[in-house]
């Protein structure tokens, strides 16, 4: 299968390396408007290089898009129009309207459209998934040092959206309320944020994301009747405290031997094309995460604006 990578910045280069090593896949082109990025990719890849994505559409069967978010819609539309299956890095698009249009286009063309919410492929999350039933409280911490990239978007769209997607994948209920706070720290966009999300089922999710820390942490905790699950997504570890009928508590532990969610999501993309089946993370999932992320962003900006206004009195 001939696959091209459009956008060879940090994530694009990672995707290119995984595709290069994947059986049955030919990396048929690397695309980036920045010639410096193409030159950096040249040291590891012999695939043809292009500065315009339209130059590769006639030779590729599928495209991995890892460009700035504001360019996602136009590039994906061109790819789908030409009959290419599309894997899109998160966040899906700049607006829900753009996402809906791409979903409809992919459906009409009978093409795979997958969004890169890679934590769905975390071995710890997959191990826990079968035991998560009717969660009542979820707490997620996604903390990172400043990456000096993805500064075109805020921390909600950059980091928190991963946990938003995980929450939506396990809570099968409508969102009833969103409260959020955040502030810029190292950029002019929100760099630290906390959101409280309430669902009709009674479940509450508290999500914290920061790209202004001295350490890295990615934990996801789920509380439900008779079970408390802790996931360390960086280490691929799951710990569950389980209450038995007699009141006794026992621990269940899982440690992944292999952690490579980027490879796993790309394998799912390629196999969904080959098998003509839906990928684990469809365009619709990307849209739902984007919609909730937008609500959190709006609540954060409203609170931040109110704080600034009150400070002038």
Regions found by a protein language model. Name each.
Residues 164-237, 263-277, 312:
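Contiguous beta-strand/loop segments that form the cofactor/metal-binding neighborhood of enzyme cores
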Residues 15, 45-103:
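Beta-loop-alpha module in the N-terminal Rossmann-like domain of NAD(P)-dependent dehydrogenases
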Residues 1-44, 167:
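N-terminal Rossmann-like dinucleotide-binding module
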Residues 116-123, 146-175, 285-286:
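Mid-domain beta-loop-alpha active-site segment that forms a flexible
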Residues 93-150:
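A contiguous active-site-proximal alpha/beta segment in oxidoreductase catalytic domains
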Residues 33, 255-267, 281:
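Active-site loop of classical SDR/Rossmann-like NAD(P)-dependent oxidoreductases
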Residues 62-65, 270-313:
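C-terminal helix-rich "cap/oligomerization" subdomain common to oxidoreductases
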């Amino acid at each position: 299968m001939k696959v091209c990578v459009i956008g060879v910045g940090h994530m694009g280069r990672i995707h290119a390396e995984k595709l290069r090593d994947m059986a049955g896949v030919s990396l048929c082109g690397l695309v980036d408007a920045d010639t410096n990025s193409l030159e950096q990719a040249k040291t590891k890849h012999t695939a043809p290089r292009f500065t315009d994505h339209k130059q590769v559409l006639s030779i590729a069967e599928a495209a991995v898009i890892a460009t700035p978010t504001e360019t996602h819609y136009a590039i994906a539309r061109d790819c789908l129009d030409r009959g290419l299956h599309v894997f899109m890095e998160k966040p899906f698009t700049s607006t829900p309207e753009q996402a809906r249009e791409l979903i409809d286009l992919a459906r009409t063309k009978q093409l795979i459209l997958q969004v890169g919410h890679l934590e769905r492929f975390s071995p710890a999350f997959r191990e826990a998934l079968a035991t998560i039933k009717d969660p009542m409280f979820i707490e997620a911490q996604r903390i990172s040092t400043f990456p000096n990239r993805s500064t075109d978007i805020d921390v909600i769209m950059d980091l928190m959206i991963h946990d938003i997607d995980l929450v939506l994948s396990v809570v099968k209920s409508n969102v009833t309320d969103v409260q959020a706070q955040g502030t810029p720290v190292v950029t002019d966009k929100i760099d630290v944020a906390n959101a409280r999300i309430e669902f009709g089922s009674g479940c509450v999710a508290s999500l914290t994301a920061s790209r202004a820390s001295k350490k890295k942490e990615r934990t996801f905790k789920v509380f439900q009747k008779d079970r408390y699950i802790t996931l360390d997504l960086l280490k691929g570890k799951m710990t569950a405290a389980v209450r038995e009928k007699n009141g006794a508590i026992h621990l269940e532990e899982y440690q992944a031997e292999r952690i490579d969610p980027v490879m796993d999501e790309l394998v799912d993309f390629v196999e969904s094309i080959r098998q003509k089946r839906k990928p684990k993370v469809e365009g619709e999932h990307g849209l739902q995460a984007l919609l909730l992320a937008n609500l959190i962003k709006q609540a954060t900006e409203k609170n931040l604006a109110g704080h600034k206004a009150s400070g002038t009195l």
